[in-house]
């Protein structure tokens, strides 16, 4: 058994009790948990997630409101297959979703229609595993969270080509039409609906109820109202009109055809706005029926609002009706039928909660931005919103407000798994509601039930396409535990509703000051996705509204509050205008700052402030980075570009056969292993009762109450995965690190393996390294390795490949798995069993048969008569051909597992199947009976002597009367599926126990039912396989890969290289005490890369190895030079790590001392075995007849245009002709050449290459006729 290792580390952190890290997978698990709310009783469920989807789509009624389908509750049943079975059979790990629906009739004519309550199956929904993944079609997938623009209002500015600043305000809803307000170069404000339809803002204001000019001017308090009298008007001569003077009158028109008289309202403009009052105007105004006129105010305030006057001038409408008609015409390009339909369009756009939804976030953001107090439950736009947005925009135009920073994290929020699923279920349920409504309308007088109305496929098809095809549903990166956990904590700005790589500019990708403690500034991919895909910081959490928060301690009057109340999580918006001190700022024992000036952050600035000015303090210096970056020791000494490479490459480290945790770590390694859920962890205190390589059995401690309510055994068995294939073909292979009789505590790690050792992450090995050139072999970052690394399996890893062969039913008959293959020697099939599958333990070489299969072959499809004769006389489908699966050219390994899945054999008689099924029914009925008896015994004991308070079912029918005593026969008669489990007695504790017992009973009963269904399926249908496939065979081959020349290796500081030479141990440079170094690295790789962390690590780890201790040096708060000197002195090593080395070949001392130390090195997943490839004879492209490209296609090397130039320059005409013809696409020539080589004849003359024919055909396609004479 593996000895347990003491991984207690010496920690150099100045903060001795930093905040505990939150659960690293919380972002996935909590979101999914909140989406389903399964642990919450239906009456207490929050209106979010799945419950909200149902609430939004139900009740469903038919068009006449006769029938109503109401939603009562939803629940899930146990999954049909376990996670392991789904992984091996290629199935989706899902649970059946069922809803309790109530159908009743409101029509008094339908007396015969009884109210029906039914449980309706709505389809299977993929269920998250305990480690935050989904198993879809046998592969583990992760739903990546999306970082997108938050709903709300955004103010921006752009520059016109003539230099004018244009301002805009955009309202982004959760669902519904976008509306944008923007100014133009003429200082007029327009509203754009859905980015295309343009109308003056005043037209929109009229359409939403501000009908007259007066109403619009009153909003902004821009006009003075003057009563129309001759005297008043005379006083105002010379002042400008702020609003039109209009005359409204009724015009009677007679219809020419019918002679009917129609009255129409007519409007005429008496005096236009912006006209000065003169004697002539006054006369006209007095003659109109106007009571008051509006004049410009004389105060300075109105000049700010010139944009409103300009817009009014552009406004073609004078009344609400005209405005509504104008909006309708703009949106629909047609005339409205009547006033109601014109009004409906604008209502539906922004004021209808069915079509428009700002969401909780949108309403919160708008209220916050515009200082409004609108009820958070109002999720549609209000007139107040629109007016305040226009006012803010006017302030922007007058430089009295500032535009929003779109990259500020208060303007971006996270869509987690739960929200993405909520959107998908919303689509699915809306579709389902439509079909339900249609079916209700068709069924007029029939009696029908909810099951008849609901089509279960609608929801599952939407959800399945989301998991299968959405850009955010990704094949999990499972190279090692770090890769897994990072993938689950990733945030992507790409995906539906997000940005696209091509359109994303520099600003979006850049690091922003609000990323501090929220998004890691280091970990992001290199390449086109840089900055668009980022990782959550170690302490970051996502708030209920979807904003990223980070914790700070409050500081009051220069004193840090270390109590639980002093620790709060802040969003980027809440952190604005706060001064934040660094996490390692020196404090005295009372929590006061020691220094008079404190280094702090204030928004994007870094001022030195007095302690009294500090508002908050970081909880830890590690807060700024993500998990991968926080794993790099001495990160503070590395250049950010190299740190980025380092954190990305650690995710590519393959799990080694003998991993070792780093001597110099950062203290986060243990937490990562526990939270990754890849190891087996004790659930609570208990004792190990059995251990072997394949399982661990633990008897957990249970209280008397827990013992009583449980139907489980006290001993829990954990099965250890052995060489399980991961998505990236690495292996998960766990070994126990506990012994029989050990006491275990909650959270204790019981196993190691899969890149962990002693409960800590162990991605690589600690190796002795020398920074010195070695005969030029480490030029350009190449790595020289000691042969000991190969011999002692330092960097040996095991990789498992899965090979699948499907047996189908073809037109010419059934394919068959067999070891009896035509024209194949007995020697080639010696390792195959009777099903043609290779035996476990067989050594595989290239070309070996893995799975033998024969397929019927015929020149043409058999006629029906032939088929009939063959069926009668049992003649096997005539000829068969070999369709076996053979090992690829680079495959060498050992078969570690084989599987065969078959649909139920047709040969089995119906009676034998029936017998087997009835036997199963009997067995499981007996198990259910025993379970029920145990339940009744427990309940009888609990209710002994107690008086009943009334036991009711869901329809409130009393089954055991209140005031009576509990009797065993009464309890036996109860159906626990429909019973209300609360308040059976007066004793609260008894009631809790009754509920717990019944819930546990129901859970076990459902599990037994699910198991019975499974067994019946196996008996009747066999294994679940895709349509058209009769059998499926799988072979797993393990390859043991030692490190070799061409493999890629790296340290944790972005120092990567390719192994260029493996040198015998005796030839490697050695230390004064005779120890040969393990690796020689080029010292020139350090200065220009500026990743000095590797030198610090090498020196400290060397001291650690000498003293047999391990260190934790957290980032930005790690070991100082003094700390390192102290340990190197203790170990008797040079402080700078420089020492004289001796040449392994001659034994002479090298002239200059070299830096020597111990560095943690990883072997990355880019191995030469996967890349090296050479083509002999292989496939050709169909049209050009040239060899294909790439290893996967067994392709050749392209001899391109530039390579041709090179041969032309040398005048190598024969080589050139050969390459361009017989070695490539001269079809006749290449077969002749092959023949000539086999027979030993001279090479034939090359013919015409096929590419010339392709060119000729293309020219013929252009209508040009050619002939080659």
Swiss-Prot record:
GO terms for biological process: DNA-templated transcription. The keyword Kinase does not apply. GO terms for molecular function: DNA binding; DNA-directed RNA polymerase activity; ribonucleoside binding. One of its GO terms (cellular component) is DNA-directed RNA polymerase complex. Pfam families: RNA_pol_Rpb2_1, RNA_pol_Rpb2_2, RNA_pol_Rpb2_3, RNA_pol_Rpb2_45, RNA_pol_Rpb2_6, RNA_pol_Rpb2_7. CDD domains: RNA_pol_B_RPB2. Gene3D superfamilies: 2.40.50.100, 2.40.50.150, 3.90.1100.10, DNA-directed RNA polymerase, beta subunit, external 1 domain, DNA-directed RNA polymerase, subunit 2, domain 6, RNA polymerase alpha subunit dimerisation domain. SUPFAM superfamilies: beta and beta-prime subunits of DNA dependent RNA-polymerase. PROSITE patterns: RNA_POL_BETA. Belongs to the RNA polymerase beta chain family. This is DNA-directed RNA polymerase subunit beta. The gene is rpoB.
